[in-house]
């Protein structure tokens, strides 16, 4: 496949305000669940690299955290990762919601995009939530703000028009051999994917004040015949949060585990024995050492990784 002189390969990044559907779109394009999704903003914390290999080319997607106003060191890290990525890729996909209103969050992104020479494709997501006739008006609103190479309306949830988007991305990639083997779908370590799946379930089940104050670490992951034993810890910032995560008689923790386990089993293609614990690390989102321990390393940005 790679000997084909017409073969293309390159990097695309998905940016946008928190909760516009970046992870849902990437999962749809790849055809497998890699990035966690929830109805709460700032679900994605690291750049997640996933790979789509086609007959005509290979697209390596970087799903970045949403660009937002940072409230702590973790927030700073997330914003820096997103903005640093813009100059490292061959094409940028900017995801927006179908609306005529351009808020402060979008204005901030527009300013960032004006600073880069990387081609930008505007992706208007969630088209399944509006009338088709209204989409043209949304396109006109955004077209006045920036010179986009392409504008593609899609529904990440339903998969509408995503095939057109893939062809648009390929158009802006350079010719060259694939970066990854054709059976590769992500460069994330398996432990990190398991931790993210557990965090996704916690995000969905827990009340508003807790989710962004949690991290998940996988302490142990061992195969025992046809079973994989996994020990993981949910880290929170307050003693009061610990009680909520565990729940009455351990019911909430059990619920998080029972929802995460089937998806982990599907991914590993084997039975999973999942043990969950909860630990308190006060104000971990403002501690450089703890951020590094939980996999958020600002030096990754400087190194361009």
Model-derived features: where do they sit?
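Canonical P-loop GTPase G-domain recognition
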Residues: 118-119, 128-186
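Active-site glycine-centered loops adjacent to acidic/histidine catalytic or metal-binding residues
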Residues: 63, 125, 155
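Conserved G1/Walker A P-loop phosphate-binding module
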Residues: 1-87
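Conserved C-terminal guanine-recognition region of P-loop GTPase G domains, centered on the G4
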Residues: 53-58, 80-151, 222-227
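P-loop NTP-binding site
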Residues: 190-305
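Conserved, well-folded catalytic cores of nucleic-acid-processing
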Residues: 32, 51-55, 70, 85, ...
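Catalytic P-loop NTPase motifs of RecA-like helicase/translocase cores
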Residues: 44, 68-69, 101-102, 130-131, ...
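Conserved glycine(s) of the Walker
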Residues: 21, 161, 252
């Amino acid at each position: 496949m790679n000997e084909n002189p017409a073969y293309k390969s390159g990097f695309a990044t998905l940016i946008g305000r928190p909760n516009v559907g970046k992870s849902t779109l990437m999962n749809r394009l790849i055809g497998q669940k890699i990035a966690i999704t929830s109805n709460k903003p700032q679900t994605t914390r690291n750049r997640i690299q996933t790979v789509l290999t086609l007959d005509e080319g290979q697209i390596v997607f970087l799903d970045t955290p949403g660009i937002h106003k940072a409230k702590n060191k973790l927030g700073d890290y997330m914003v820096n990762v997103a903005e640093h990525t813009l100059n490292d890729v061959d094409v940028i996909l900017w995801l927006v919601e179908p609306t005529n209103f351009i808020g402060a969050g979008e204005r901030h992104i527009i300013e960032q995009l004006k600073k880069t020479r990387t081609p930008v494709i505007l992706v208007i997501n969630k088209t399944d939530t509006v009338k088709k006739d209204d989409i043209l008006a949304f396109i006109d609103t955004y077209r006045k703000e920036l010179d986009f190479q392409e504008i593609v309306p899609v529904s990440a949830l339903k998969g509408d028009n995503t095939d057109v988007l893939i062809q648009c991305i390929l158009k802006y990639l350079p010719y060259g051999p694939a970066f990854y083997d054709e059976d590769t779908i992500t460069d994330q370590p398996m432990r990190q994917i398991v931790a993210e799946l557990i965090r996704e379930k916690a995000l969905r089940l827990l009340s508003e004040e807790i989710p962004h104050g949690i991290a998940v670490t996988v302490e142990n992951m061992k195969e025992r015949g046809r079973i994989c034993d996994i020990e993981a810890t949910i880290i929170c910032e307050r003693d009061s949060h610990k009680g909520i995560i565990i729940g009455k008689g351990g019911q909430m923790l059990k619920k998080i585990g029972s929802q995460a386990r089937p998806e982990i089993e599907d991914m590993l293609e084997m039975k999973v024995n999942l043990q969950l614990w909860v630990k308190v690390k006060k104000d971990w989102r403002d501690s450089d050492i703890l951020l590094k321990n939980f996999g958020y390393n600002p030096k990754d940005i400087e190194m361009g990784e």
